[in-house]
């Protein structure tokens, strides 16, 4: 089967987070020679398929210790869950439709197209040297993600099955297939700052202490401020205010406090501690409370790594373009792999219609992406 045929089948399952809808049974049926590991918690299902090709023999000096030499373990990872389709589609979002060179359906780009491409490439994998190939899929990436990839990786660590390298087939490209590889992601810190004042009647300002006035004086130092200068792969870390709230709704009462909710997307140069230190300097001598809660950590895979080199080589060969290495965008499951010291990158189709009405992927993209992924498998298994 090719990438198009598999992707069509995947789209036909209405796997809105965290529903799995039997899609894993279909995927397992494609790989009868692979070992299967599954885990389920709180309605979230995860699937891990793996196979060791040409298992290496024990080194003579290690025979007594019964230690086997481990082959390179490469993993394709992704999610089969999708966001709700909404209304006003030109066709049924869960009935894959081909029109004018595009495949339409919810998840076509995010990310059943990428999954279909790597499943098809994996079916064609036939290395001549010792090589371990695995596939990790979850039904909860678009949701909280607590019991998805993160949980499965805990199980894999327990069983000594963690991969060495991973490609997460998220839709990373902007205009043409091959123009972008995500080699890392920024971290995310959620914050809440409450500036305290003294509530009172607006007619007696000397008896009040309006925290909004206080906020106005420090706002230029916190709203949209760059926390560092970034680097070659990371944009400058930035603090962005997402919500402000003050007052009782009455026009003759000054508020007793003002609440500022914010988020900081940050590089490796900024941490929770450095952000706290900066805000404490800005807020010196003011009455306030501050809460900071990291929701994800920044990470990056070295641009000279074997995985990135092989991927770039096959993108150039297949797509005739040199990809930009970057860390733009929101968080993804790639961060969970990085936490275990695993080389991980993200590469997939164009992302111009993710989560949108009439989501679609071009048939040519699926064909080329499968070739890139197969080339990566061949390249890694030879090295």
From Swiss-Prot:
It catalyses: N-succinyl-(2S,6S)-2,6-diaminopimelate + H2O = (2S,6S)-2,6-diaminopimelate + succinate. The keyword Hydrolase applies. Disulfide bonds: none annotated. Its cofactor is Zn(2+); Co(2+). Zn(2+) 1 binds at residues 79, 110, 170. This is Succinyl-diaminopimelate desuccinylase. The active site is at 81, 141 (proton acceptor). Keywords: Amino-acid biosynthesis, Cobalt, Diaminopimelate biosynthesis, Hydrolase, Lysine biosynthesis, Metal-binding, Zinc. Its EC number is 3.5.1.18. Belongs to the peptidase M20A family. DapE subfamily. Catalyzes the hydrolysis of N-succinyl-L,L-diaminopimelic acid (SDAP), forming succinate and LL-2,6-diaminopimelate (DAP), an intermediate involved in the bacterial biosynthesis of lysine and meso-diaminopimelic acid, an essential component of bacterial cell walls. The gene is dapE.
